[in-house]
Amino acid sequence: MWVGRPGSEALRKAFGGKPDKAPKVGRKGKGKATIDTPIEPIVLATANVSGVLPGREGSPVLVVGAHMDHLGEGTSSSLAPGVKAIHNGADDNASGVAVILEIARVLGALPVAERPYTVCFVAFGAEEMGLLGSKHYVENLPPALRGRMVAMLNFDMVGRLGSEQDLVIAGMGTSSVWPELVERTRGTQEIRTSDDGYGASDQTSFYEAGLPVLHFFTGTHSDYHKPSDDVDKINFAGAATVADIALRVLHAISTEGIMPDYIKVARTAPARGGFKVSLGTIPDYGAKVDGVRLTGVREGGAAAKAGLRKGDVIQRIGEREVHNLDDYMATFAVLEPGKEVEVAVEREGKPVTVTLVPDAPSRR
């Protein structure tokens, strides 16, 4: 048991400044102890930053958002444990903020006649703490504005588009208009899609409130939630491509008078903070493989302890086959902390099986 300075001082005083008078504690046997300690909660203020680009009076409203917070000098979410260093979050999520600023710049230069819909731009705070900023935004919308909203586009980690990182657009199943609209606006850019409107980013808050959503994302990587996620690794041309596709989507919705319908899609994964277990894996969301390829594993996590490593392709967890990310995320609902499970992977073309013991998720 670790005792801090205040506690050690209290113990010293309790025994008259003579630690040798304290009762001896053996290594065997059972015992009980009661400790009372004052806990003072720390409450910090955060904020969302928003701006409105008006369209025609009373026009439908589109929301374009990205979270602007990151991890400071590292929190329990850092994947560089024990390292106290600024986590700049160039990809997560300065890249998303840069994209929405570029979209605002381009749309703002158009005459009102060419932007018949109103666009709300929002940089959300406290996303890393559990989507708190976007939840607050949605829950506190004026009814008149909420009633005019027709869709939300979210940008989270869009700075690594490249030969090994595809553009993933999630939320395609949240409206019947998305598949055709995205297909004709993506140009020559290859994309991967997911129907799910839920996920560990701010589109979830809007989807839960009944809005169709699209989430733009270029995948995780070995710098995710580490100090090494810095500007020198950003693909600026790739981020511009993401912005260009989003602009075409927004322009088509606005000028063609499209009113995206809302479709409730079955949730394939728990929301952020809702997982029963932590595996310590970093999936490659853009990999085109049968299974789930890992871009890394968290040091000291369950996957690392089991011997999993970067490049492994997970193909089975327990009795469940894993062909894609949806299969992978579905296993989280049946795994239990501390209960062994067999994980089959492909490693450098060869089958490998390991025994993994899931951890309980860390709590902030």
Task: Give the role of each language-model region.
Residues M1-G89, E102-R105, A109-P116, E139:
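Soluble metallo-hydrolase cores and metallopeptidase-like ectodomains found primarily
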Residues V3, A98, R105, S222-R267:
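His/Asp/Glu-rich mid-to-C-terminal helical/loop segments that flank catalytic regions of hydrolases
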Residues V112-A126, M152-F155, E256-G273:
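Acidic/histidine-enriched alpha-helical segments
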